[in-house]
Amino acid sequence: MPHVYVSNALSGDIHVMQWADTGRLTLTSTCVVGAGPGPICISPMTERMYVAKRGEPNSLVCLQLDRTHGQLNLLYEMPLTARMCNLRIDRTGRFLLAVSYHSHSLTVCPLTPAQPAASNHTVMSTLRHPHAAVFSPDNRFVLVPCLGDDGVMVFGFDESRGQLTLHTQWQARAGSGPRHLCFHPEGQWLYLLNELDATLDVLAWDAAQGTLQHMQTLNTLPSGFTGKPWAADIHVSADGQFVYTCDRSSSTLAVFKADAQRGALTWLAHVPTELQPRSFALDVDGRHVLVAGQKSNHLGVFERDAQTGLLTFTQRLATGEEPGWVTCLA
C-alpha cells in the first residue's frame, strides 16, 4: 500500500500514514528522530530515507525504509555543515545534494552503504540564499533557484565523481525570489515558483546546451488578496497536464492547466488549505493532493480529478507539531 510521510519540526518526529481500504488516510506509526526534522528525500535505488535536521547541531538522519509496511528505523546520524532546506538525490542514487539557504551553500555527499565520512563532502558557498536543487532528466545538470541572486544557477554535474561546475545562470526579475522548481515530465519545460512575489515562471529547457529561456509569467495569488506574498512549493502531475503551487500567506493552492504542445499554463482555480502550507505532495497514483499546514498541525487531503485537475477536500488529519514537509511513496 502507498505510504505518506510527514516531518514535524517542533515535535521532532516523522508521521507514517497509509491509505486504508475505506479510502481514508490513517496514521500507522511515528518515528522519533529528535528536534528539527525538515526536508525528506527517499533514495530511488535503496531502501533508505534521508532527513535533514534543522537545529543545533545540524545533521543528516538516515533511516531504513520498509517499503511494504512503511516503517522507519534509524541507521545513522551524521553532522552537516549548515541548516539545510532541501535535499535531492541524483538519478544514479550515488550522491545526495543538500541546500542551505542560511549558509548560502550546496553540499554534495556521496551515499555509501555505511555512514559517509564528513571529509568526503564537497561544499560550495558561492550562492546567495539558494533554496532548492533539481537534477535535469538526463542527470547532466543541477538547477538551483537562488532567492538572493534572483536567478537560477545551472551547474554541470559529473555523475561519476559527484562534481559540480558552474555552467550558466538564468536571471529572474529583481525582487521575485526564486524558490522551488520542477520539470515537466517531457523534460523540455520547467516551472519556477518565486517566493517573494508569488509568481510562476514557465521556462523552456534546452537539454543539449543546458540553458533556460523565459516563456511566461503568471500570478499564483487569489484575486483580491492584499497580504504579503509568501509562495512555498510547486508540483506537476505525472501526466504533465496540471501544475499546482501553494502560498503560505493566503493559505491557498493554485491550480493551472498545462498546454500539451507548448507547456504554457492557464489558471484554473484557487483552493483554501490548512494554515500556512509550506509543503504539499501528489500521491503516487495522482488521485490525491496532501497539504501540510505548518501552523495548524494538520494535513489536508484533497481528491484530485485526473481529467480536470480540480481538487475536492475530503479529510483533515492531525500531524505532529509544525509539519514542514510531506512526501509519498508507493
For each feature predicted by the language model, list its residue ranges.
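Loop-centered beta-sheet repeat module
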Residues: 142-199
